[in-house]
């Protein structure tokens, strides 16, 4: 892909990066490592290894090696997670490690530290309770002070809903304009978006048998996009929601500034 001008981004848990270090260093635009901890103990609790030994230091060492002479950006990802008992009571949370993790990310030379709320299997925000939210809120305030010109702390727009305990995201529009700009290509087929991958009535084609150009201009894709109604089909939190709101305003005539910031990863 890289040799043909296709930009490649990789998300990984980081445990086996050493096997592909040359490719990760030289053929990616970005690598984002899902760590979700800032210490061996918390890592083992939320990302346990079958050996019983925490892989935290192994992952951090491999990230450090990647960063030494990387060509693209390297990010440290932290999803806020909690463990619950059978009645839904919170037993523990990795949110206590947020500040430690951000400091580790900065120390090893990551370009950014990303904090995200957890979602359930249907893409609705996971309700983790007031105590976890308060813990995360405190740490998020602290780690913003770690930012510099070359190290950023980033959060998705959904973090604000997480802070407020809002688990759904109602939509005011009945079409998805973002789906005219992107899709989701997988081994099982090509879908309207990543949220509907695996859903047969949202499958616009199959790149195993047809070119993307043929899929994109097919009657099947046109028919499916006419049926997609975010008010009905997308009550979960969608990362493209703000983009859709802006596109709807642009369709009504709103003018926006054009920036020289072309990026294949829209």
Question: What feature does the model see in each segment?
Answer:
Residues 4-7, 23-210, 226, 246-266:
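Radical SAM enzyme [4Fe-4S]-AdoMet core and its adjacent flexible, acidic
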Residues 12-17, 80-83:
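Short beta->alpha connector loops
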Residues 169, 216-236:
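Immediate flanking context of iron-sulfur cluster ligation sites
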Residues 192-195, 230-243:
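Local cysteine-cluster metal-coordination motifs and their immediate loop/turn environment
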Residues 212-214:
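Conserved ATP/PPi-binding loop(s) of AMP-dependent carboxylate-activating enzymes
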């Amino acid at each position: 892909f890289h040799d043909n001008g296709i930009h490649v981004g990789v998300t990984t848990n980081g445990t086996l990066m050493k096997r592909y270090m040359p490719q990760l260093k030289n053929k990616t635009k970005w690598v984002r490592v899902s760590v979700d901890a800032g210490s061996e103990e918390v890592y083992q609790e939320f990302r346990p290894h079958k050996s019983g030994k925490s892989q935290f230091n192994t992952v951090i060492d491999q990230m450090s090696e990647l960063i030494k002479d990387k060509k693209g950006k390297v990010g440290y990802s932290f999803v806020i997670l909690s463990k619950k008992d059978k009645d839904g009571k919170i037993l523990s949370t990795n949110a206590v490690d947020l500040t430690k993790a951000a400091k580790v990310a900065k120390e090893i030379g990551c370009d950014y530290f990303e904090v995200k709320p957890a979602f359930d299997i249907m893409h609705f925000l996971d309700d983790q309770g007031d105590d976890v939210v308060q813990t995360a809120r405190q740490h998020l305030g602290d780690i913003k002070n770690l930012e510099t010109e070359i190290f950023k702390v980033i959060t998705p727009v959904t973090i604000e809903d997480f802070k407020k305990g809002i688990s759904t995201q109602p939509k005011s529009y009945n079409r998805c304009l973002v789906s005219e700009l992107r899709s989701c290509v997988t081994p099982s087929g090509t879908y309207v978006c990543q949220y509907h991958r695996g859903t047969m009535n949202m499958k616009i084609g199959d790149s195993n048998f047809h070119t993307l150009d043929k899929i994109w201009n097919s009657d099947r894709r046109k028919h499916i996009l006419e049926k997609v109604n975010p008010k009905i089909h997308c009550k979960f939190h969608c990362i493209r929601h703000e983009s859709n709101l802006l596109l709807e305003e642009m369709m009504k005539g709103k003018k926006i500034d054009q920036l020289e910031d072309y990026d294949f990863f829209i």
